[in-house]
């Protein structure tokens, strides 16, 4: 899987001149569930106030922006990689695959793809696309580029909702509170109740719990 060198922040203004797709992920660290990615093409004629890294926003603010993004964006697509794919590929490659899926699912072709972080997959030859798309990684892009901020928010809200649904099915694990991250409460639930099908079997705390069965 191709990886490209991250660009400097000085180049951001040039790259955001066209109808680019901002891409970000949520859920690399949790022990359970999908890694969720979003690709968003914003409408430059419909600016959205308050976009920022989703981790710096309250849940209420994220939900409000989530609605506004869906009302104003030109295109939005979600890409997933399942726990099984994470276990098979590793979390990095599964995340890259999910990003490819998100971009491939867009209703329109972006002029380029800007990804939060220090690496990006090759969006020209993903499993569902043969588009010739230039991509760039932008370190801390979710706080610098509006489209990446929007993708961060969309992915965060989607994944949090998934965890809320999983919490309804398995309330004893407390997923609505810790969202699947490796917290003390999650470790205690794993020890007491065991591993669920949705858990990532390759992650050490889960693997160690399975070894005790």
Swiss-Prot record:
One of its GO terms (molecular function) is RNA-DNA hybrid ribonuclease activity. HAMAP family: RNase_HII_B. InterPro entries: RNase_HII, RNase_HII/HIII, RNase_HII/HIII_dom, RNaseH-like_sf, RNaseH_sf. Residues 18-213 form the RNase H type-2 domain. It catalyses: Endonucleolytic cleavage to 5'-phosphomonoester. It is found in: Cytoplasm. Manganese or magnesium. Binds 1 divalent metal ion per monomer in the absence of substrate. May bind a second metal ion after substrate binding. It holds the Pfam family RNase_HII. Its cofactor is Mn(2+); Mg(2+). Keywords: Cytoplasm, Endonuclease, Hydrolase, Manganese, Metal-binding, Nuclease. Endonuclease that specifically degrades the RNA of RNA-DNA hybrids. Belongs to the RNase HII family. The keyword Cytoplasm applies. Its EC number is 3.1.26.4. One of its GO terms (cellular component) is cytoplasm. This is Ribonuclease HII. It comes from Shewanella sediminis (strain HAW-EB3). It is an enzyme of class 3 (hydrolase). A divalent metal cation binds at residues 24-25, 116. It comes from the Bacteria. SUPFAM superfamilies: Ribonuclease H-like. GO terms for biological process: DNA replication, removal of RNA primer; mismatch repair.
């Amino acid at each position: 899987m191709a990886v490209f060198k991250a660009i400097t922040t000085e180049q951001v203004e040039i790259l955001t001149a066209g109808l680019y797709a901002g891409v970000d992920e949520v859920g690399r660290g949790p022990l359970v569930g999908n890694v969720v990615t979003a690709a968003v093409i914003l409408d430059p004629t419909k600016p959205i106030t308050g976009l920022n890294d989703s981790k710096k926003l309250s849940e209420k603010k994220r939900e409000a922006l989530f609605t506004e993004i869906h009302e104003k964006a030109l295109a939005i697509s979600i890409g997933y990689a399942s726990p099984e794919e994470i276990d098979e590929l590793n979390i990095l490659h599964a995340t890259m695959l999910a990003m490819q899926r998100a971009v491939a699912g867009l209703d329109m072709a972006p002029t380029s793809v800007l990804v939060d972080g220090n690496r990006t997959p090759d969006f020209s030859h993903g499993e569902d696309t043969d588009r010739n798309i230039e991509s760039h990684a932008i370190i801390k892009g979710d706080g610098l580029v509006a489209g990446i901020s929007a993708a961060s928010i969309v992915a965060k809200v989607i994944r949090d909702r998934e965890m809320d649904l999983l919490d309804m099915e398995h309330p004893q694990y407390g997923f609505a509170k810790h969202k699947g991250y490796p917290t003390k409460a999650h470790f205690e639930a794993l020890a007491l109740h065991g591993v669920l099908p949705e858990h990532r079997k390759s992650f050490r705390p889960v693997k160690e719990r399975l070894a005790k069965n």
